[in-house]
């Protein structure tokens, strides 16, 4: 059920309450300690003032006081030792954190120096950020439902960046690209000139370049430094930044307002051999910067897939860690479609940062069906009036899969709008869906309209969804709604469809296939791409014995 809010809503009151409780407890402890010391001192002084007749009692009292003082000193020494031990433990934990972060960085890319000033700036910034970071665990709120130990406890093995054995796969991917579309291709996170459309001089449409200069050289790698929108997921974006190189970064500049502008970004991941238990292959960390100039328009289509050579997909163990930064100038429009179909042994962490200026529009439609663990940190900040943001996501979690979306939208200006629709199907008892969506409407964001809804479908018993939609409203002239539903297939809906002469199996198939149709239908990139996405959903469901008998 959706609920509306028109008043300020923050969590500061509960935090203040916790602070007061903590302060009261500390004062109570001090009073108890002081009272004990007074009693001890009083007893000792009284015994010192006794008459000669009570000398024996005085000696006994002094002895007890001496013993008590000895115990107090011992306790103090023990406390000091405990403090030293805790300090040593903290230092040890920090050392382990640093060791893992360095291991992750070194496994992703070699550490040779670069003559590019923007590369050195990004690496220096990331080094400082990571020195203040700690390795995430399930004890951290942001990682409670994501088994991050799959990454942090694994032995990371750097994968060969060679493009061998991917030719047939890439040809198959490119066959679905509409005529006239530009292509940006990455193989194991490394930019591929062979399969990309490098065109740095296109002054009227869309240019693709590996040369980072001007305003982009200043902006790239800075969006994760905004503390207002950033969360604990930033550590992987910062590892990506620490691995910056000129050959794992691509820049897309959109200059034309032609609505037919299309850019395909293909992320092909492969592992040349099976990995031992506990090993996780990794490669370069891809980063894309999209600069949509004033009044420009573009459709960006991203496709993630595991390739195994000879056109065959296989489930190899690897970790992909990518970042996309998008800047929209005034009146720019970006339609973003994303399909993630990694193999079911892969781990994928991704961050998307969006900055929107006045009257711009950003829309994403993403479908995630692959990977053993998938985490998308999506951060959007509106930087001007009349800005429009649409975030649409369909996740499918099957056997032993976790599909996790963490999003944050910041509205800072008047008459902004945002609409977030999240759908998740969990088709296995060992599958898990996670949604943590945050929308913050700041004080100056008057006359805004913010909507957020998450709908989750559990197809089997013991399937799990952890959903937390969150609206923080500080402005007082707004229209905001949010809601959350978690359910299995409704018997009434099944009965209604069966009453039309269809079998229960077809009725079930209709309801399941229709659950994510709204998101898929909104994708750009042509009908071939949409059909590809539908097939990935159908294939993923079939792995968990959920057959779609209708298209």
Q: Which stretches of residues belong to each language-model region?
A:
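Compositionally biased low-complexity segments, especially N-terminal hydrophobic helices
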Residues: 36-42, 48-57, 61-62, 70-84, ...
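N-terminal chloroplast transit peptides
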Residues: 1-53, 58
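Conserved beta-strand/loop scaffold segments within soluble protein domains that form the structured core
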Residues: 222-502, 516, 520-551
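Residue-identity detector for glycine
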Residues: 17-19, 65, 79-80
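Short, low-to-moderate order helix/coil transition modules at the start of elongated helical scaffolds
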Residues: 64-68, 83-334, 339, 343-344
């Amino acid at each position: 059920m959706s609920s509306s809010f028109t008043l300020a809503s923050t969590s500061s009151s509960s935090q203040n309450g916790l602070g007061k409780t903590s302060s009261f407890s500390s004062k109570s402890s001090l009073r108890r300690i002081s009272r004990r010391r007074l009693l001890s001192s009083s007893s000792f002084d009284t015994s010192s003032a006794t008459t000669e007749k009570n000398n024996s009692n005085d000696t006994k009292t002094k002895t007890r006081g001496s013993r008590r003082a000895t115990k107090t000193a011992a306790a103090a020494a023990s406390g000091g030792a405990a403090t030293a031990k805790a300090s040593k433990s903290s230092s040890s934990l920090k050392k382990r954190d640093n060791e893992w972060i360095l291991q992750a960085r070194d496994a992703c890319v070699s550490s040779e120096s670069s003559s590019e000033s923007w590369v050195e700036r990004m690496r220096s910034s990331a080094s400082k950020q990571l020195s203040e970071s700690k390795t995430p665990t399930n004890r951290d709120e942001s990682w409670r439902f994501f088994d991050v130990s799959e990454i942090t406890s694994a032995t990371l093995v750097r994968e060969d960046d060679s493009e061998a054995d991917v030719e047939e796969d890439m040809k198959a991917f490119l066959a679905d690209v509409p005529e006239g579309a530009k292509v940006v291709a990455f193989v194991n996170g490394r930019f591929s000139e062979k399969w990309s459309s490098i065109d740095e001089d296109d002054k009227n449409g869309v240019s693709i370049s590996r040369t980072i200069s001007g305003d982009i050289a200043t902006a790239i790698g800075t969006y994760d430094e905004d503390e207002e929108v950033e969360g604990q997921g930033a550590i992987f974006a910062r590892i990506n930044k620490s691995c910056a190189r000129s050959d794992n970064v691509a820049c897309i500049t959109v200059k034309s307002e032609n609505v037919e502008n299309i850019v395909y970004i293909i992320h092909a991941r492969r592992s040349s051999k099976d990995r031992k238990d506990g090993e996780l292959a990794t490669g370069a960390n891809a980063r894309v910067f999209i600069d949509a100039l004033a009044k420009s328009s573009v459709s960006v289509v991203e496709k993630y897939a595991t390739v195994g050579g000879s056109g065959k997909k296989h489930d190899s163990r690897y970790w992909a860690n990518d970042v996309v930064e998008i800047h929209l100038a005034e009146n720019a429009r970006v339609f973003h479609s994303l399909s993630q179909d990694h193999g079911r042994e892969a781990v994928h962490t991704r961050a998307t940062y969006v900055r929107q200026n006045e009257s711009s529009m950003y829309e994403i439609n993403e479908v995630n069906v692959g990977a053993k663990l998938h985490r998308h940190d999506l951060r959007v900040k509106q930087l001007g009036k009349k800005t429009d943001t649409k975030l649409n996501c369909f996740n499918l979690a099957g056997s032993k899969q976790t599909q996790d979306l963490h999003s944050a939208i910041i509205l800072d200006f008047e008459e902004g709008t945002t609409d977030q629709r999240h759908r998740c199907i969990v088709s296995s008892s060992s599958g898990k869906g996670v949604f943590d969506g945050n929308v913050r409407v700041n004080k100056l964001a008057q006359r805004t309209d913010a909507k957020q809804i998450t709908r989750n479908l559990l197809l089997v018993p013991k399937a799990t969804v952890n959903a937390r939609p969150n609206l923080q409203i500080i402005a007082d002239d707004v229209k905001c709604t949010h809601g959350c539903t978690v359910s299995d297939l409704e018997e009434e809906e099944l009965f209604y469809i069966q009453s039309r002469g269809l079998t229960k199996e077809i009725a079930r198939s209709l309801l399941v296939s229709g659950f994510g149709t709204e998101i898929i239908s909104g994708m750009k990139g042509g009908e071939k791409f949409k059909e590809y996405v539908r097939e990935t959903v159908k294939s993923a469901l079939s792995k968990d014995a959920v057959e779609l008998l209708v298209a």
